[in-house]
């Protein structure tokens, strides 16, 4: 930008072409001076509202070439116009060129400089300009101080802003509402919302009347941080203080309440604002619809959609997509399809989220042909599928045991510029593991690592489980030991897989050692861990140890579940201990559980070959 200015300053002569004059005529609503040429003074005084960079530079050039030189008020007017168009860096460059031309600043040009410096986060330069003001013998006014205070607050330097307020007061300047609003905003940006509220209360005590600008940042931070109860209290306080409310303030709190899951409170506030004469807009409706949909309350979401349409507020793609996704999750695919048709009839184009939700619905219903058709449709409409779209469809193929089709889609998606993520690889690896195609699964895992797609805890669980289930527990243990040494945080789920794999490989003693070491690793066993270990001990024939562990799990705060009881009942039946099994059956009933199909089958088989009395069967009912 500076280079552009310097280049223009090297140019000589008057305005260069008729085309250029024509441009000025359009931009500045120029007035002729009788010679066909419009002076810079007339341009500046004609009330410029907007100005482009090139035009500002050219006008500045003309001003610096003029003799006698323009007054500083004319430069101030130009800088103000450029600043209003948010070309702050350009203003600073023009100010620099003015200095190089030997044109001294005054209070107004320096104040404009300070404002621009603060706007583009150049605070050191802003304070340098402040120093020039004092050096030239001017006294900074309240506006200048407030500008610097706001700049400090936007940078998160609130303590320095407060010090500057003290200095401002010492110099005899009283802070204005603009000053205090800047401080409130700064405190909120730093997450100090309680301090912001205290400052507002002090403002009121000292005679200041806060306005809607004061409260806006506080409400936003409160709602963003989940402090919606405090936001509601503040709203009531605003009403008491006769602060002007609007739909935006209600929208902030409604959004916060929806994100907190307080949907009924959000809906009550929605009704309250309507009663008070504030009309809900598309943003508020969409916020509520999404909130209800995420909570599974599709009926309330659908009612709001109909209410929108009734009030002539056209729902957008976000509202329709939220409802379609909710219908899919609730298993209401037909309703989702109907809503998709309706949005098209209303001229609303579905987006990636819409199509992806419908593809998800078709995959869940095993309608893969329709899912593929929807994928083709979205591409034909110029709507690009994302990684989630492909992950859903690949998962659909895997669930339908069409793993090769899933792999083919996986290879094709890279041609569309979509990069596979951890979920993509996890889905395919699990699919191949479940089909017993362990070599392909291992190859995919290696490909995942080589392509720098970082495996997560789920990736390792899938791989370790696949290795254990497909007869490679040693390889699973080798990988497990590596990740245990890494910085990855392991949960009880991954330990359960390894303990289960060891038990199935008849390495019950090793499994027991790992089980006993869990507390030392800072990992708490869950009911599944106990069930696996009890099952392993039973499989080994160590029923007394299994019974002891069964009682110990209760002491450790883990109540046995139906699976625990069934494991022990079958183990004792297998050892011919009908009495112990009978006691466990009575206990399982008291706990509200029931014997499972495997236990019933075992009892029936034992009855048929005479190993149990027929009276034992009555105990199961």
From Swiss-Prot:
It comes from the Eukaryota. It holds the Pfam family PPR_1. InterPro entries: Pentatricopeptide_rpt, TPR-like_helical_dom_sf. One of its GO terms (cellular component) is mitochondrion. PROSITE patterns: PPR. Keywords: Repeat. Coiled coil: none annotated. Belongs to the PPR family. P subfamily. This is Pentatricopeptide repeat-containing protein At1g12620. It comes from Arabidopsis thaliana (Mouse-ear cress). The lineage of its organism: Eukaryota, Viridiplantae, Streptophyta, Embryophyta, Tracheophyta.
